[in-house]
UniProtKB/Swiss-Prot annotation:
Pfam family, one: Ureidogly_lyase
Domain of life: Bacteria
Segments traversing the membrane: none
Stated role: Catalyzes the catabolism of the allantoin degradation intermediate (S)-ureidoglycolate, generating urea and glyoxylate. Involved in the utilization of allantoin as nitrogen source.
GO biological process annotation, one example: purine nucleobase catabolic process
Gene responsible for this protein: allA
Protein known as: Ureidoglycolate lyase
InterPro entries in alphabetical order: RmlC_Cupin_sf (IPR011051), UAH_cupin (IPR047233), Ureidogly_lyase (IPR007247), Ureidogly_lyase_bac (IPR023525), Ureidoglycolate_lyase_dom_sf (IPR024060)
Length: 169
């Protein structure tokens, strides 16, 4: 099996735009509410829930920690809904995404999310399951429920991708 190394990039709205939304207050529209006592950072992600009898779900995922090197052997996507991950412990995490290549994901890209950033994967975006760093971490996850199966998995057979370091280049 051939192994190709991925370089970790810093997570920015511009770099992540083809895959979804970076959830952060920086650059967000600010609205004062509750008689000016609360700052509301408005409309941070595009939540999608398509299909039959759908609704948004709010979950907490507890991710086990990963240490480098990390081998990316598979990816998944959700054809009927977006999926958002917002860290609750303020710890950084890795985000691995790929464009669609027709028969599966294209070459993945790896991003390092700060502990004050979340991500929202748009529908049909290939991504690796949760990659918490440092220690076990909790994430608020906004997901989709509905009748249709909302999970497709792809396992790389000819080669894998490796993240040698969790630091950005």
């Amino acid at each position: 099996m051939q192994i190709e190394t991925l370089t970790v990039e810093p997570l920015t709205k511009e770099a992540f735009a083809p895959f979804g939304d970076v959830i952060e207050v920086e650059g967000a529209q600010l609205r004062l509410i509750n008689n000016g006592t609360t700052e509301r950072y408005h409309d941070l992600a595009r939540v999608e829930a398509a299909g039959t009898q759908t609704r948004a779900l709010i979950n907490i995922f507890r991710g086990q920690s990963f240490a480098a090197p990390i081998d990316i052997m598979m990816m998944e996507r959700h054809p009927f809904g977006s999926q958002a991950f917002i860290p609750l412990n303020g710890r950084p995490f890795l985000v691995v995404v790929a464009e669609d290549a027709g028969a599966g994901p294209a070459r993945p890209r790896a991003f390092l999310a700060r502990g004050d950033q979340g991500v929202n994967y748009l529908r049909n975006i290939w991504h690796h399951p949760l990659l918490a760093l440092e220690q076990k971490s909790d994430f608020l996850v906004v997901d989709r429920a509905g009748r249709e199966d909302n999970l497709e998995e792809y396992f790389f057979s000819d080669y894998a991708y490796r993240i040698e370091t969790t630091q950005t280049a």
